[in-house]
């Protein structure tokens, strides 16, 4: 995967899991709880291969000394660090996101936090622009499940903090897992230039629509068929008043 230009900051969303039998992928109606995530159900060997590819791409386009924030459950504490090291990324510490409202799970204790692996590209002194009293516990209210557009949607505030701590206005930010587009919205709010990738075409559409609604602007398609134009045409055909 080729990602350019080089980035001052990288934000990558980790994987999440839910029972495969509950996944009901649909083309017209997109509900995060019904749509499976790409690469969500893979073997340990395949997951290791994917980690090397993902972290390798982050390191390849990240400037030396610049940071990456990688979300992932605590179970990844044994998986991420060795691959980060192999990719030339220094694993500094974890940041704990306290969601303020617990998440119902099948475990004995409800989940109320998520881990972020804070790392930077080796080869230069790392850049940190946050205050001296910044802590590794971020209390940020989670997105209301009724308004979520992606199964692992993160609050925009999380991306805003990462950008303010590790990048300057006008610099580039890369998100290899675009998902709901929270990173793009955070970049708009903080004056950064965001570059997003998303494997699922439907979530690409979600990101574009969310950006258009937030900015009031119209996204321009660089190449290929316009899914929104085709969708509007289908709606016109279904509307007998047109």
Residue spans for each PLM region:
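S-adenosyl-L-methionine-dependent nucleic acid methyltransferase catalytic domains
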Residues: 1-103, 107-111, 118-122, 126, ...
């Amino acid at each position: 995967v080729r990602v350019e230009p080089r980035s001052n900051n990288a934000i990558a969303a980790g994987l999440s899991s839910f029972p495969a039998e509950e996944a009901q992928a649909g083309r017209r109606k997109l509900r995060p709880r019904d749509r499976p995530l790409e690469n969500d159900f893979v073997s340990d060997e395949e997951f290791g291969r994917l980690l090397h590819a993902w972290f390798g791409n982050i390191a390849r386009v990240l400037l030396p000394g610049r940071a990456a924030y990688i979300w992932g459950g605590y179970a990844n504490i044994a998986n991420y660090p060795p691959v980060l090291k192999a990719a030339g990324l220094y694993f500094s510490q974890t940041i704990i996101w306290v969601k303020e409202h617990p998440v119902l799970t099948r475990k004995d204790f409800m989940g109320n936090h998520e881990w972020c692996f804070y790392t930077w590209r080796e080869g230069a002194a790392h850049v940190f622009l946050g205050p001296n009293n910044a802590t590794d516990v971020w209390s940020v209210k989670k997105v209301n499940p009724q308004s979520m557009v992606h199964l692992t949607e993160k609050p925009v505030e999380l991306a805003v903090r990462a950008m303010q701590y590790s990048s300057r206005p006008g610099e580039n930010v890369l998100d290899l897992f675009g998902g709901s587009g929270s990173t793009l919205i955070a970049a708009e709010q903080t004056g950064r230039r965001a570059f997003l990738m998303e494997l699922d075409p439907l979530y690409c559409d979600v990101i574009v629509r969310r950006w258009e609604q937030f900015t009031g602007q119209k996204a321009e398609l660089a190449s290929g068929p316009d899914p929104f134009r085709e969708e509007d045409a289908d709606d016109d055909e279904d509307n007998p008043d047109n």
